[in-house]
Amino acid sequence: SYFYSIGKPKKNRILCIKNSFHGRTLAAIYASGSKKMTEGFGPKIPGFSHIAFKDTKPRFPKIKNKIKKNTAAIMVETIMGEGGIKPIPDKCLQYLRKLCNKKKILLILDEVQCGIGRSGDFFAYERSKVKPDIVPIAKGIGGGFPIGAVLMNKKVASGMTPGTHGSTFGGNPLAMAVG
């Protein structure tokens, strides 16, 4: 939505870590890059490229080659859950932020599983001093009640004009009170 809103509709690919976990919707399972997650679901959702977790050490050596003209964002779990409890090193998060700034793409740090105090910090990314553009959160805000939110900076929010994003259950009063 952000790149579309600024006249760059072809900038729509997201680079993710293979075997990550970003949810169970059709697009989210393809973001995972995991055959286990996508087997039996189709057609394949385009728009995702992947790097292996090992390429996060020490400074994502292969990631530069994966960023193309149509890359819109890099999305990583700050602490990988499904692929084993593997925190992304602070230096790697810092490198990703610098790389995203240089390439003029967004940094999405998925904190659905590890955010809201579950890592010892309010957000796991805070220890790295990195400021992401987008932060999906969920499990920690509802204490077991189904609720989620997507936090974003002003620049990204400027692309979220009325009618560009919606949810069947969005804004549920009980969920909002619990969260």
Please state what every model-predicted region is.
Residues 1-179:
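Conserved N-terminal phosphate-binding loop of PLP-dependent enzymes in the Aspartate aminotransferase
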